[in-house]
Each structure stands twice: as C-alpha cells, then as structure tokens.
Swiss-Prot record:
GO terms for molecular function: 3'-5'-RNA exonuclease activity; RNA binding. It is an enzyme of class 3 (hydrolase). One of its GO terms (cellular component) is cytoplasmic exosome (RNase complex). InterPro entries: ExoRNase_PH_dom1 (IPR001247), ExoRNase_PH_dom2 (IPR015847), ExoRNase_PH_dom2_sf (IPR036345), PNPase/RNase_PH_dom_sf (IPR027408), Ribosomal_Su5_D2-typ_SF (IPR020568), RNase_PH (IPR050080), Rrp41 (IPR011807). Belongs to the RNase PH family. Rrp41 subfamily. GO terms for biological process: gene expression; rRNA catabolic process. Pfam families: RNase_PH, RNase_PH_C. The keyword Cytoplasm applies. This is Exosome complex component Rrp41. It comes from Pyrobaculum aerophilum (strain ATCC 51768 / DSM 7523 / JCM 9630 / CIP 104966 / NBRC 100827 / IM2). HAMAP family: Exosome_Rrp41 (MF_00591). Signal peptide: none annotated.
C-alpha cells in the first residue's frame, strides 16, 4: 500500500485538524434547483453533492409501472470537474451505476411508494466536488430533495461515513483517509425511526471497532439531521412569510 503524503493521525489529531469523532463543516441548502420539484445541496467539508427530484409523474413506458406502488429511479454522477482526474468521462462509470443502485436501495425504506401507484419518481445526484464520503453526502442530499418535493416519507435518511485510520475509528472520512485508511463504513440512518438503511463494510474490523463505529455513526447522523431539519424548516418558514407576511 502506498504511504500517504502526510500523517493521517498524529497525537489524536487528524491531518485536517479534526479529532476522530468530529465531522467536517456541514452545509445544507434546500430548493437550490428552481426547475425541479425538490432539490438540495449538501456539503461535508469540500465534498459537495446536489440532488434534484422530479415527480411523482406518470411512468413511461407504461409497462414498467407497478399497479400497487411507485417506482423510484436514482442516477448518481460525478461531474467531470469534481476530481483531479482529467480522464473522468461524462458517461456513467461502473462505480456510478453501482452507487446509483446503492442510493436507491438506501432511500426506498424511507419512501411511502404505495402512495404513488403507476408513477415514477426520478432522483438525480451530481457530485460537484469530491473529497471523500461522496455516497453518504449524496444520500443526505437525495433524502432532503425528496422531502422538499413533498414526497411521503417515513423519515429522512442521513448518510455518514466511518473509517479506520491507523487503527483508530474516525467519523466522516475525507479524501486522504478514504484513499489511505484501513477501513471504510458508509451508513444511512433514519434518526427518528432509529433504523439503518445502508451499511457497507470494507476492511478488517474487530467487533469492538464495529460497535464503536455504529455508535459514532449514529451521533454523526443525529448532528447532520439537526442541520437538515433546520434547512427544511427555514425554507418553508420563508415561503410562509412571503405569502402571509411577517
């Protein structure tokens, strides 16, 4: 394995100055795409994801519709300028196709698709800048965009990542930690229902490390959830003020 250009963890401090249990700065905005039914932008540090939702609308072709529930389709894409890799193709890669499927499966437990028979809901996620944890930032953005679109939901899904760096469990992997760390654990969590909708494990984890990672992920997800809820509330409070006055 290649050595990282800088020490990832030194005296309990990570390369970017964070402690192991600290998220990067989280920024969330809702309603950022004017022509979408719902949209959101989520930043975890330098990683930025934008999600746009269209629907529910009639399924075409009709033979793909389901009589008792709606169909949700998710497309994850990394903008060609999102990474330093100049060879990034605008066409979907195998990884993008895989993550699109992962995101759909992580979102579906939160969506009441039975409310939308013979309909489809399209979710588009674009990574504008990538510095680790892109799939979990995308998951949070997509969940918020669905809520912004007024889709019936059981709960928001918040994505966070936990990893192993020099044998230490850390929250919210940045790009260096993602590339050079010993383990990666992206998770999706519904804070009100206290249920995981996504859990992928990469690397060698002991039982104690895994349990510590789950606890850290829940704390991180609950922190992000508060910011996400405030972003939704602020948007609709501002709309109400415009309609009814202060």
């Amino acid at each position: 394995m290649k050595r990282p250009p800088v020490p990832l963890l030194q005296n309990g401090v990570r390369a970017d100055g964070r402690t192991p249990d600290q998220m990067r700065e989280v920024k969330i905005a809702v309603g950022v795409v004017s022509n979408a039914d719902g949209s959101a932008m989520v930043s975890y540090g330098a990683t930025t994801a934008v999600a746009a939702v269209y629907g529910p609308r009639e399924m075409h072709p009709r033979h793909l519709s389901l009589p008792d529930r709606g169909v949700m389709r998710v497309r994850y894409h990394m903008a060609p300028f999102s990474t330093k890799d100049e060879r990034k193709s605008p066409t979907p890669s195998r990884r993008e196709i895989e993550i699109s499927k992962i995101l759909r499966e992580a979102l579906e437990p939160a969506i009441v698709l039975e409310q939308y028979p013979r309909s489809r809901i399209d979710v588009f996620v674009e990574i504008l800048q990538a510095d680790g944890s892109t799939r979990v930032a995308s998951l949070t953005a997509a969940s918020l965009a669905l809520a912004d679109a007024g889709i019936y939901m059981r709960d928001l899904v918040v994505g966070v990542s936990v990893g192993l760096v020099d044998g230490t469990v850390v929250l919210d992997l940045n790009g260096l930690e993602d590339q050079y760390g010993e383990g990666d654990l992206p998770l999706g969590y519904m804070p009100n229902l206290k249920r995981f909708t996504l859990l992928q494990l990469d690397g060698a984890w002991t039982r104690d490390m895994f349990l510590q990672a789950l606890n850290l992920a829940v704390r991180g997800a609950e922190y992000v959830y508060q910011i996400a809820r405030d972003a939704l509330k602020n948007k609709y409070m501002s709309i109400a003020e415009e309609i009814y006055g202060r």
